[in-house]
Amino acid sequence: MNNSTNSSNSGLALTSPYKTFEVVFIVLVAGSLSLVTIIGNILVMVSIKVNRHLQTVNNYFLFSLACADLIIGVFSMNLYTLYTVIGYWPLGPVVCDLWLALDYVVSNASVMNLLIISFDRYFCVTKPLTYPVKRTTKMAGMMIAAAWVLSFILWAPAILFWQFIVGVRTVEDGECYIQFFSNAAVTFGTAIAAFYLPVIIMTVLYWHISRASKSRIKKDKKEPVANQEPVSPSLVQGRIVKPNNNNMPGSDEALEHNKIQNGKAPRDAVTENCVQGEEKESSNDSTSVSAVASNMRDDEITQDENTVSTSLGHSKDENSKQTCIKIVTKTQKSDSCTPANTTVELVGSSGQNGDEKQNIVARKIVKMTKQPAKKKPPPSREKKVTRTILAILLAFIITWAPYNVMVLINTFCAPCIPNTVWTIGYWLCYINSTINPACYALCNATFKKTFKHLLMCHYKNIGATR
Protein backbone atom coordinates (compact mmCIF):
# COMPACT_ATOMS: atom_id res chain seq x y z
CA MET A 1 0.00 0.00 0.00
CA ASN A 2 0.99 3.62 -0.23
CA ASN A 3 0.06 6.65 1.86
CA SER A 4 -1.68 5.71 5.07
CA THR A 5 -3.71 8.90 5.02
CA ASN A 6 -4.51 11.57 2.48
CA SER A 7 -1.86 14.24 2.61
CA SER A 8 -4.61 16.85 2.44
CA ASN A 9 -5.58 15.92 5.98
CA SER A 10 -2.84 18.09 7.51
CA GLY A 11 -4.13 20.18 10.34
CA LEU A 12 -7.04 17.82 10.99
CA ALA A 13 -8.88 18.76 14.12
CA LEU A 14 -8.44 16.34 16.99
CA THR A 15 -12.13 15.50 17.02
CA SER A 16 -14.12 12.76 15.30
CA PRO A 17 -15.51 13.81 11.91
CA TYR A 18 -18.44 11.40 12.35
CA LYS A 19 -21.65 11.53 14.34
CA THR A 20 -22.34 8.97 17.06
CA PHE A 21 -24.56 6.69 14.96
CA GLU A 22 -21.98 6.86 12.14
CA VAL A 23 -19.24 5.84 14.54
CA VAL A 24 -21.33 2.90 15.77
CA PHE A 25 -22.03 1.83 12.19
CA ILE A 26 -18.36 2.07 11.17
CA VAL A 27 -17.22 0.13 14.23
CA LEU A 28 -19.79 -2.63 13.68
CA VAL A 29 -18.95 -3.03 9.99
CA ALA A 30 -15.19 -2.81 10.48
CA GLY A 31 -15.30 -5.10 13.50
CA SER A 32 -17.33 -7.67 11.58
CA LEU A 33 -14.92 -7.57 8.65
CA SER A 34 -11.98 -7.98 11.01
CA LEU A 35 -13.63 -10.97 12.72
CA VAL A 36 -14.51 -12.65 9.41
CA THR A 37 -10.97 -12.07 8.16
CA ILE A 38 -9.45 -13.61 11.28
CA ILE A 39 -11.76 -16.64 11.30
CA GLY A 40 -11.46 -17.22 7.55
CA ASN A 41 -7.68 -17.20 7.46
CA ILE A 42 -7.38 -19.31 10.60
CA LEU A 43 -9.65 -21.84 8.87
CA VAL A 44 -7.30 -21.85 5.87
CA MET A 45 -4.23 -22.42 8.02
CA VAL A 46 -5.84 -25.12 10.18
CA SER A 47 -7.31 -26.86 7.12
CA ILE A 48 -3.90 -27.18 5.49
CA LYS A 49 -2.46 -28.39 8.79
CA VAL A 50 -5.02 -31.13 9.50
CA ASN A 51 -5.96 -32.33 6.00
CA ARG A 52 -3.15 -34.23 4.31
CA HIS A 53 -4.78 -33.80 0.90
CA LEU A 54 -4.26 -30.04 1.25
CA GLN A 55 -0.58 -30.36 2.17
CA THR A 56 0.79 -29.53 -1.26
CA VAL A 57 3.43 -27.07 -2.44
CA ASN A 58 0.81 -24.80 -3.98
CA ASN A 59 -1.18 -24.72 -0.74
CA TYR A 60 1.94 -23.91 1.29
CA PHE A 61 2.06 -20.66 -0.68
CA LEU A 62 -1.60 -20.11 0.20
CA PHE A 63 -0.70 -20.79 3.85
CA SER A 64 1.86 -17.98 3.74
CA LEU A 65 -0.70 -15.68 2.12
CA ALA A 66 -3.20 -16.58 4.85
CA CYS A 67 -0.62 -15.65 7.51
CA ALA A 68 -0.27 -12.19 5.98
CA ASP A 69 -4.04 -11.78 5.73
CA LEU A 70 -4.46 -12.88 9.35
CA ILE A 71 -2.03 -10.21 10.57
CA ILE A 72 -3.96 -7.61 8.58
CA GLY A 73 -7.22 -8.78 10.16
CA VAL A 74 -5.83 -8.68 13.69
CA PHE A 75 -3.80 -5.46 13.67
CA SER A 76 -4.13 -3.32 10.55
CA MET A 77 -7.93 -3.29 10.27
CA ASN A 78 -8.56 -2.48 13.91
CA LEU A 79 -5.92 0.23 14.25
CA TYR A 80 -7.08 1.92 11.06
CA THR A 81 -10.68 1.78 12.31
CA LEU A 82 -9.57 3.49 15.51
CA TYR A 83 -7.74 6.14 13.51
CA THR A 84 -10.80 6.69 11.30
CA VAL A 85 -13.55 7.00 13.91
CA ILE A 86 -11.57 9.14 16.36
CA GLY A 87 -10.30 11.44 13.64
CA TYR A 88 -6.69 11.54 14.85
CA TRP A 89 -3.91 9.16 15.88
CA PRO A 90 -4.03 8.75 19.68
CA LEU A 91 -1.20 6.25 20.25
CA GLY A 92 1.89 8.36 19.66
CA PRO A 93 4.62 8.35 16.99
CA VAL A 94 6.34 5.10 18.04
CA VAL A 95 3.20 2.96 17.76
CA CYS A 96 2.35 4.81 14.56
CA ASP A 97 5.63 3.87 12.91
CA LEU A 98 5.42 0.28 14.15
CA TRP A 99 1.88 -0.05 12.79
CA LEU A 100 2.86 1.40 9.43
CA ALA A 101 5.92 -0.85 9.20
CA LEU A 102 3.85 -3.93 10.01
CA ASP A 103 1.07 -2.89 7.63
CA TYR A 104 3.34 -2.27 4.67
CA VAL A 105 5.58 -5.29 5.25
CA VAL A 106 2.58 -7.63 5.46
CA SER A 107 0.84 -6.03 2.48
CA ASN A 108 3.99 -6.31 0.39
CA ALA A 109 4.43 -9.92 1.52
CA SER A 110 0.92 -10.63 0.22
CA VAL A 111 1.87 -9.25 -3.18
CA MET A 112 5.11 -11.26 -3.17
CA ASN A 113 3.21 -14.44 -2.31
CA LEU A 114 0.82 -13.80 -5.20
CA LEU A 115 3.81 -13.41 -7.50
CA ILE A 116 5.29 -16.68 -6.23
CA ILE A 117 1.98 -18.50 -6.78
CA SER A 118 1.75 -17.12 -10.32
CA PHE A 119 5.33 -18.04 -11.22
CA ASP A 120 4.91 -21.50 -9.67
CA ARG A 121 1.84 -22.22 -11.75
CA TYR A 122 3.47 -20.77 -14.86
CA PHE A 123 6.50 -23.07 -14.59
CA CYS A 124 4.27 -26.05 -13.81
CA VAL A 125 2.40 -25.56 -17.05
CA THR A 126 5.28 -24.50 -19.31
CA LYS A 127 8.08 -26.71 -17.90
CA PRO A 128 6.34 -29.91 -16.77
CA LEU A 129 9.40 -32.12 -17.21
CA THR A 130 12.11 -29.97 -15.62
CA TYR A 131 10.37 -27.85 -12.98
CA PRO A 132 8.67 -30.52 -10.81
CA VAL A 133 11.98 -32.09 -9.79
CA LYS A 134 12.96 -28.73 -8.27
CA ARG A 135 9.52 -28.10 -6.78
CA THR A 136 10.07 -29.45 -3.29
CA THR A 137 8.76 -28.46 0.11
CA LYS A 138 12.21 -27.12 0.98
CA MET A 139 12.26 -24.94 -2.12
CA ALA A 140 8.78 -23.64 -1.32
CA GLY A 141 9.87 -22.76 2.22
CA MET A 142 12.89 -20.86 0.91
CA MET A 143 10.76 -18.89 -1.54
CA ILE A 144 8.23 -18.00 1.15
CA ALA A 145 10.99 -16.93 3.55
CA ALA A 146 12.58 -14.82 0.82
CA ALA A 147 9.25 -13.07 0.17
CA TRP A 148 8.89 -12.08 3.82
CA VAL A 149 12.53 -11.10 4.33
CA LEU A 150 12.58 -9.00 1.17
CA SER A 151 9.35 -7.25 2.17
CA PHE A 152 10.80 -6.47 5.60
CA ILE A 153 14.04 -5.10 4.14
CA LEU A 154 12.21 -2.94 1.61
CA TRP A 155 9.82 -1.24 4.03
CA ALA A 156 10.65 -1.57 7.73
CA PRO A 157 14.02 0.27 7.89
CA ALA A 158 12.81 3.17 5.75
CA ILE A 159 9.58 3.63 7.72
CA LEU A 160 11.18 3.33 11.15
CA PHE A 161 14.39 5.28 10.58
CA TRP A 162 13.62 7.88 7.90
CA GLN A 163 13.19 10.62 10.49
CA PHE A 164 16.68 9.89 11.79
CA ILE A 165 18.13 9.84 8.28
CA VAL A 166 16.80 13.32 7.45
CA GLY A 167 17.28 14.53 11.03
CA VAL A 168 13.71 15.64 11.76
CA ARG A 169 10.22 14.14 12.06
CA THR A 170 7.82 16.04 9.82
CA VAL A 171 4.67 14.02 10.65
CA GLU A 172 2.42 16.27 12.71
CA ASP A 173 1.05 15.25 16.09
CA GLY A 174 -2.25 13.42 15.82
CA GLU A 175 -1.44 12.10 12.35
CA CYS A 176 0.06 8.84 11.17
CA TYR A 177 1.55 8.40 7.72
CA ILE A 178 4.88 7.46 6.18
CA GLN A 179 7.15 10.47 6.28
CA PHE A 180 8.97 9.92 2.99
CA PHE A 181 5.61 9.82 1.16
CA SER A 182 5.51 13.60 1.43
CA ASN A 183 7.60 13.49 -1.74
CA ALA A 184 5.30 13.12 -4.76
CA ALA A 185 7.95 11.37 -6.85
CA VAL A 186 8.54 8.75 -4.15
CA THR A 187 4.80 8.19 -3.79
CA PHE A 188 4.42 7.71 -7.53
CA GLY A 189 7.40 5.35 -7.69
CA THR A 190 6.28 3.16 -4.81
CA ALA A 191 2.77 2.88 -6.28
CA ILE A 192 4.25 1.61 -9.53
CA ALA A 193 6.60 -0.83 -7.78
CA ALA A 194 4.13 -2.10 -5.17
CA PHE A 195 1.02 -2.51 -7.32
CA TYR A 196 1.15 -1.75 -11.03
CA LEU A 197 4.30 -3.69 -11.87
CA PRO A 198 3.23 -6.84 -9.95
CA VAL A 199 -0.23 -6.68 -11.56
CA ILE A 200 1.29 -6.47 -15.03
CA ILE A 201 3.61 -9.41 -14.31
CA MET A 202 0.82 -11.56 -12.85
CA THR A 203 -1.53 -10.75 -15.72
CA VAL A 204 1.08 -11.71 -18.32
CA LEU A 205 1.89 -14.93 -16.44
CA TYR A 206 -1.76 -15.90 -16.19
CA TRP A 207 -2.24 -15.21 -19.89
CA HIS A 208 0.60 -17.63 -20.66
CA ILE A 209 -0.85 -20.18 -18.22
CA SER A 210 -4.28 -19.97 -19.84
CA ARG A 211 -2.86 -20.19 -23.35
CA ALA A 212 -0.71 -23.22 -22.49
CA SER A 213 -3.66 -24.99 -20.87
CA LYS A 214 -5.93 -24.36 -23.86
CA SER A 215 -3.20 -25.52 -26.22
CA ARG A 216 -2.82 -28.79 -24.34
CA ILE A 217 -6.59 -29.36 -24.34
CA LYS A 218 -6.68 -28.93 -28.12
CA LYS A 219 -3.72 -31.28 -28.48
CA ASP A 220 -5.44 -33.89 -26.33
CA LYS A 221 -8.56 -33.75 -28.51
CA LYS A 222 -6.61 -34.17 -31.75
CA GLU A 223 -4.12 -36.90 -30.79
CA PRO A 224 -5.31 -40.54 -30.95
CA VAL A 225 -4.73 -42.77 -27.96
CA ALA A 226 -2.27 -45.65 -28.40
CA ASN A 227 -3.02 -48.92 -26.69
CA GLN A 228 -0.56 -49.96 -24.04
CA GLU A 229 1.75 -52.87 -24.74
CA PRO A 230 1.14 -55.80 -22.39
CA VAL A 231 3.78 -56.32 -19.76
CA SER A 232 5.32 -59.75 -19.66
CA PRO A 233 5.10 -61.51 -16.31
CA SER A 234 8.81 -62.19 -16.62
CA LEU A 235 9.46 -58.47 -16.32
CA VAL A 236 7.63 -58.25 -13.02
CA GLN A 237 10.21 -57.85 -10.31
CA GLY A 238 8.40 -57.66 -7.04
CA ARG A 239 8.97 -58.87 -3.55
CA ILE A 240 6.05 -59.83 -1.33
CA VAL A 241 6.66 -58.93 2.28
CA LYS A 242 5.09 -61.25 4.79
CA PRO A 243 2.67 -59.36 7.00
CA ASN A 244 4.01 -59.21 10.49
CA ASN A 245 4.17 -56.70 13.27
CA ASN A 246 7.59 -55.43 12.22
CA ASN A 247 6.72 -54.37 8.70
CA MET A 248 3.16 -53.26 9.19
CA PRO A 249 3.21 -49.52 8.65
CA GLY A 250 1.89 -47.17 11.26
CA SER A 251 1.04 -44.59 8.64
CA ASP A 252 -0.26 -44.49 5.10
CA GLU A 253 3.10 -43.51 3.70
CA ALA A 254 4.84 -46.84 4.49
CA LEU A 255 4.87 -48.49 1.07
CA GLU A 256 7.64 -50.30 -0.78
CA HIS A 257 8.19 -49.21 -4.39
CA ASN A 258 9.47 -51.71 -6.95
CA LYS A 259 9.59 -50.64 -10.59
CA ILE A 260 8.75 -52.67 -13.67
CA GLN A 261 10.33 -51.13 -16.72
CA ASN A 262 8.79 -51.39 -20.20
CA GLY A 263 10.81 -49.53 -22.79
CA LYS A 264 12.83 -46.62 -21.51
CA ALA A 265 13.67 -45.73 -17.94
CA PRO A 266 11.55 -43.10 -16.22
CA ARG A 267 12.66 -39.53 -16.19
CA ASP A 268 13.10 -37.94 -12.81
CA ALA A 269 11.35 -34.84 -14.00
CA VAL A 270 7.93 -36.41 -13.80
CA THR A 271 8.29 -37.77 -10.28
CA GLU A 272 6.15 -35.03 -8.78
CA ASN A 273 2.72 -33.81 -9.67
CA CYS A 274 2.54 -30.02 -9.91
CA VAL A 275 -1.13 -30.04 -9.11
CA GLN A 276 -1.76 -32.40 -6.22
CA GLY A 277 1.04 -34.93 -6.52
CA GLU A 278 2.15 -34.57 -2.95
CA GLU A 279 -0.99 -36.29 -1.71
CA LYS A 280 -0.18 -39.28 0.42
CA GLU A 281 -1.26 -42.76 -0.60
CA SER A 282 -3.05 -45.21 1.59
CA SER A 283 -3.86 -48.89 1.42
CA ASN A 284 -7.43 -50.08 1.58
CA ASP A 285 -8.67 -52.57 4.15
CA SER A 286 -11.02 -54.26 1.71
CA THR A 287 -11.83 -57.97 1.80
CA SER A 288 -12.17 -58.50 -1.95
CA VAL A 289 -10.07 -58.08 -5.08
CA SER A 290 -10.63 -54.62 -6.53
CA ALA A 291 -9.13 -52.47 -9.23
CA VAL A 292 -9.57 -48.73 -9.18
CA ALA A 293 -8.60 -46.84 -12.30
CA SER A 294 -7.50 -43.29 -11.67
CA ASN A 295 -5.64 -42.55 -14.89
CA MET A 296 -5.67 -38.79 -15.10
CA ARG A 297 -3.49 -38.61 -18.19
CA ASP A 298 -4.22 -41.90 -19.95
CA ASP A 299 -4.59 -40.17 -23.27
CA GLU A 300 -0.93 -39.23 -23.22
CA ILE A 301 0.47 -42.69 -22.53
CA THR A 302 2.54 -43.83 -25.51
CA GLN A 303 3.18 -47.35 -26.69
CA ASP A 304 6.95 -47.37 -26.41
CA GLU A 305 7.64 -44.92 -23.63
CA ASN A 306 6.04 -45.74 -20.33
CA THR A 307 7.03 -46.75 -16.88
CA VAL A 308 5.01 -48.97 -14.60
CA SER A 309 5.75 -48.73 -10.90
CA THR A 310 4.35 -51.06 -8.31
CA SER A 311 3.95 -50.31 -4.65
CA LEU A 312 3.66 -53.23 -2.29
CA GLY A 313 2.31 -52.72 1.18
CA HIS A 314 0.18 -54.26 3.84
CA SER A 315 -2.89 -53.38 5.79
CA LYS A 316 -2.58 -51.92 9.24
CA ASP A 317 -4.67 -54.78 10.53
CA GLU A 318 -2.35 -57.26 12.18
CA ASN A 319 -4.64 -60.21 11.34
CA SER A 320 -4.90 -59.30 7.67
CA LYS A 321 -3.11 -61.19 4.91
CA GLN A 322 -3.71 -58.51 2.31
CA THR A 323 -1.27 -57.28 -0.28
CA CYS A 324 -1.79 -53.85 -1.82
CA ILE A 325 -0.27 -53.12 -5.21
CA LYS A 326 -0.19 -49.71 -6.80
CA ILE A 327 0.61 -49.48 -10.52
CA VAL A 328 1.71 -46.02 -11.62
CA THR A 329 2.10 -45.47 -15.35
CA LYS A 330 4.08 -42.37 -16.15
CA THR A 331 4.56 -40.91 -19.59
CA GLN A 332 7.74 -39.29 -20.83
CA LYS A 333 6.03 -37.16 -23.46
CA SER A 334 3.39 -35.70 -21.23
CA ASP A 335 3.27 -31.93 -21.08
CA SER A 336 1.38 -32.14 -17.83
CA CYS A 337 2.78 -32.53 -14.36
CA THR A 338 0.15 -35.12 -13.50
CA PRO A 339 1.25 -38.76 -13.85
CA ALA A 340 -1.24 -41.49 -14.62
CA ASN A 341 -1.79 -44.21 -12.09
CA THR A 342 -3.82 -47.34 -11.60
CA THR A 343 -4.28 -48.83 -8.17
CA VAL A 344 -4.84 -52.55 -7.76
CA GLU A 345 -5.58 -54.20 -4.46
CA LEU A 346 -4.96 -57.89 -4.13
CA VAL A 347 -6.05 -60.02 -1.21
CA GLY A 348 -4.10 -63.19 -0.67
CA SER A 349 -5.39 -66.12 1.29
CA SER A 350 -3.67 -67.20 4.43
CA GLY A 351 -2.46 -70.41 2.79
CA GLN A 352 -0.63 -68.79 -0.08
CA ASN A 353 3.12 -68.70 0.02
CA GLY A 354 5.33 -65.94 -1.33
CA ASP A 355 5.74 -67.45 -4.83
CA GLU A 356 2.01 -67.91 -5.29
CA LYS A 357 1.34 -64.35 -4.23
CA GLN A 358 4.02 -63.06 -6.59
CA ASN A 359 2.45 -64.96 -9.51
CA ILE A 360 -0.93 -63.45 -8.70
CA VAL A 361 0.68 -60.01 -8.57
CA ALA A 362 2.27 -60.56 -11.98
CA ARG A 363 -0.97 -61.77 -13.56
CA LYS A 364 -2.90 -58.84 -12.13
CA ILE A 365 -0.34 -56.35 -13.45
CA VAL A 366 -0.39 -57.97 -16.91
CA LYS A 367 -4.19 -57.86 -16.93
CA MET A 368 -4.30 -54.20 -16.02
CA THR A 369 -1.57 -53.13 -18.48
CA LYS A 370 -3.29 -54.94 -21.35
CA GLN A 371 -6.27 -52.66 -20.99
CA PRO A 372 -6.28 -49.82 -23.54
CA ALA A 373 -6.01 -46.33 -22.18
CA LYS A 374 -9.25 -44.41 -22.17
CA LYS A 375 -9.69 -40.89 -23.34
CA LYS A 376 -10.01 -38.57 -20.38
CA PRO A 377 -10.63 -34.84 -20.09
CA PRO A 378 -7.91 -32.63 -18.58
CA PRO A 379 -7.42 -33.21 -14.85
CA SER A 380 -10.06 -31.54 -12.73
CA ARG A 381 -7.47 -30.84 -10.02
CA GLU A 382 -5.42 -28.83 -12.48
CA LYS A 383 -8.50 -26.79 -13.29
CA LYS A 384 -9.11 -26.21 -9.58
CA VAL A 385 -5.62 -24.80 -9.07
CA THR A 386 -5.83 -22.55 -12.12
CA ARG A 387 -9.32 -21.37 -11.18
CA THR A 388 -8.21 -20.60 -7.61
CA ILE A 389 -5.26 -18.54 -8.84
CA LEU A 390 -7.51 -16.60 -11.22
CA ALA A 391 -9.97 -15.83 -8.41
CA ILE A 392 -7.17 -14.64 -6.10
CA LEU A 393 -5.64 -12.40 -8.79
CA LEU A 394 -9.00 -10.88 -9.73
CA ALA A 395 -9.81 -10.21 -6.08
CA PHE A 396 -6.41 -8.57 -5.60
CA ILE A 397 -6.72 -6.33 -8.66
CA ILE A 398 -10.33 -5.29 -7.98
CA THR A 399 -9.76 -4.43 -4.31
CA TRP A 400 -6.37 -2.73 -4.67
CA ALA A 401 -6.94 -0.81 -7.90
CA PRO A 402 -9.18 2.03 -6.54
CA TYR A 403 -6.71 3.01 -3.82
CA ASN A 404 -3.68 2.93 -6.10
CA VAL A 405 -5.48 4.98 -8.74
CA MET A 406 -6.22 7.57 -6.05
CA VAL A 407 -2.55 7.52 -5.04
CA LEU A 408 -1.54 8.63 -8.53
CA ILE A 409 -4.28 11.27 -8.65
CA ASN A 410 -3.28 12.53 -5.21
CA THR A 411 0.29 12.97 -6.45
CA PHE A 412 -0.85 15.69 -8.86
CA CYS A 413 -4.04 16.93 -7.17
CA ALA A 414 -4.28 16.36 -3.42
CA PRO A 415 -7.66 18.13 -2.89
CA CYS A 416 -9.29 16.05 -5.65
CA ILE A 417 -9.82 13.01 -3.39
CA PRO A 418 -12.42 13.45 -0.60
CA ASN A 419 -11.39 11.97 2.72
CA THR A 420 -14.35 9.54 2.79
CA VAL A 421 -13.47 8.18 -0.67
CA TRP A 422 -9.85 7.84 0.40
CA THR A 423 -10.84 5.88 3.50
CA ILE A 424 -13.09 3.54 1.49
CA GLY A 425 -10.31 2.90 -1.02
CA TYR A 426 -7.85 2.15 1.76
CA TRP A 427 -10.33 -0.23 3.39
CA LEU A 428 -10.86 -2.07 0.11
CA CYS A 429 -7.21 -3.11 0.24
CA TYR A 430 -7.88 -4.67 3.63
CA ILE A 431 -11.04 -6.39 2.39
CA ASN A 432 -8.87 -8.35 -0.03
CA SER A 433 -7.64 -10.28 3.03
CA THR A 434 -11.27 -11.10 3.85
CA ILE A 435 -12.07 -12.31 0.34
CA ASN A 436 -9.10 -14.64 -0.17
CA PRO A 437 -10.35 -17.51 2.07
CA ALA A 438 -13.70 -17.38 0.25
CA CYS A 439 -11.82 -17.75 -3.05
CA TYR A 440 -10.17 -20.94 -1.79
CA ALA A 441 -13.49 -22.40 -0.64
CA LEU A 442 -15.44 -21.51 -3.79
CA CYS A 443 -12.77 -22.80 -6.17
CA ASN A 444 -11.59 -25.88 -4.26
CA ALA A 445 -14.07 -28.45 -2.98
CA THR A 446 -11.52 -29.94 -0.58
CA PHE A 447 -11.05 -26.59 1.16
CA LYS A 448 -14.81 -26.11 1.27
CA LYS A 449 -15.46 -29.52 2.84
CA THR A 450 -12.65 -29.08 5.36
CA PHE A 451 -13.96 -25.63 6.34
CA LYS A 452 -17.39 -27.17 6.88
CA HIS A 453 -16.02 -29.98 9.04
CA LEU A 454 -14.06 -27.51 11.19
CA LEU A 455 -16.98 -25.11 11.64
CA MET A 456 -19.34 -27.97 12.56
CA CYS A 457 -16.71 -29.58 14.82
CA HIS A 458 -16.74 -32.80 12.77
CA TYR A 459 -13.14 -33.86 13.33
CA LYS A 460 -13.52 -37.57 12.50
CA ASN A 461 -11.64 -38.44 9.30
CA ILE A 462 -11.05 -34.75 8.60
CA GLY A 463 -7.46 -35.53 7.66
CA ALA A 464 -8.62 -37.62 4.69
CA THR A 465 -11.30 -35.25 3.38
CA ARG A 466 -11.15 -34.78 -0.38
Curated annotation (Swiss-Prot):
SUPFAM superfamilies: Family A G protein-coupled receptor-like
Post-translational modification, as annotated: Phosphorylated in response to agonist treatment.
Entry keywords, A to Z: Cell membrane, Disulfide bond, G-protein coupled receptor, Glycoprotein, Membrane, Phosphoprotein, Postsynaptic cell membrane, Receptor, Synapse, Transducer, Transmembrane, Transmembrane helix
Listed GO MF terms: G protein-coupled acetylcholine receptor activity
Membrane topology: Multi-pass membrane protein
Residue ranges, Cytoplasmic side: 46-59, 120-139, 210-387, 443-466
Transmembrane segments: 23-45, 60-80, 98-119, 140-162, 185-209, 388-410, 419-442
Keyword Signal: no
Chain intervals with Polar residues compositional bias: 284-293, 304-313
GO biological process: adenylate cyclase-inhibiting G protein-coupled acetylcholine receptor signaling pathway; chemical synaptic transmission; G protein-coupled acetylcholine receptor signaling pathway; G protein-coupled receptor signaling pathway, coupled to cyclic nucleotide second messenger; regulation of heart contraction; regulation of smooth muscle contraction
First-listed, main subcellular location of the protein, grouped into a coarse class: membrane
Chain segments carrying region Disordered: 218-320
Stored InterPro entries: GPCR_Rhodpsn, GPCR_Rhodpsn_7TM, Musac_Ach_M2_rcpt, Musac_Ach_rcpt
Glycosylation sites: 2-3, 6
Motif (Important for signaling) on chain: 120-122, 436-440
Record localization: Cell membrane; Postsynaptic cell membrane
Sequence ranges of Basic and acidic residues compositional bias: 254-270
Disulfide pattern: 96-176, 413-416
PROSITE patterns for this protein: G_PROTEIN_RECEP_F1_1, G_PROTEIN_RECEP_F1_2
Extracellular face of the membrane: 1-22, 81-97, 163-184, 411-418
GO cellular component: dendrite; plasma membrane; postsynaptic membrane; synapse
Xref: PANTHER family: 5-HYDROXYTRYPTAMINE RECEPTOR (PTHR24247), MUSCARINIC ACETYLCHOLINE RECEPTOR M2 (PTHR24247:SF207)
Assembly: Interacts with ARRB1 and ARRB2. Interacts with RACK1; the interaction regulates CHRM2 internalization.
Chain's role: The muscarinic acetylcholine receptor mediates various cellular responses, including inhibition of adenylate cyclase, breakdown of phosphoinositides and modulation of potassium channels through the action of G proteins. Primary transducing effect is adenylate cyclase inhibition.
Official protein name in the record: Muscarinic acetylcholine receptor M2
